[in-house]
Regions:
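Small beta-barrel nucleic-acid-binding modules, primarily SNase/OB-fold domains
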Residues: 1-149
């Protein structure tokens, strides 16, 4: 019945990455042949036009391109794609890698994940990536400002 369907949707499955849009969005092909856009759950990377936006994309690209990642759907479709937790073949959490390298903000409105808080704090303390720019603004604020233009 309906419940059974929901369980199937939440199961993780492998995806072959074919392109990377920005620091938290990639396009991949699932085994069934469906090409979908995926958005990494619980982080927000700088937009391409923001400081470090290009670097964030490049970092994600280096982690995932031409590789398979396991994705686990989290809360459905967003305008940016299917929201997923993504793990690499080495079992690294993509969101955690992005936070730890200073290429994403942690969206604490999504999940209370101590590991993510620690990784973001590490990057802040090291002053790396987005944290090298004292005047950086969170992408969700940036999008608001630029939507008006």
């Amino acid at each position: 019945g309906k419940r059974h369907q929901a369980e199937i949707v939440q199961r993780s499955y492998p995806v072959r990455i074919i392109s990377v849009e920005d620091g938290d969005t990639f396009v991949g092909v699932a085994d069934g042949g469906d090409t979908l856009t995926y958005n990494v759950y619980s982080i927000d990377a700088p937009e391409i036009d923001q400081p470090q936006g290009y670097e964030a994309r490049k970092y994600l690209y280096n982690i995932v391109l031409q590789r398979r990642v396991e994705v686990t759907p989290k809360g459905g479709q967003t305008p940016c794609g299917v929201r997923v937790i993504a793990t690499t073949r080495d079992n690294d959490d993509v969101a955690d890698l992005m936070l730890r390298s200073g290429y994403a903000w942690y969206r604490n409105d999504t999940v209370n994940e101590l590991r993510y808080i620690r990784s973001e704090r590490f990057a802040q303390e090291e002053g790396i990536g987005i944290w090298a720019h004292p005047d950086n603004i969170a992408p969700w604020e940036w999008r608001k400002q630029h939507a008006k233009e």
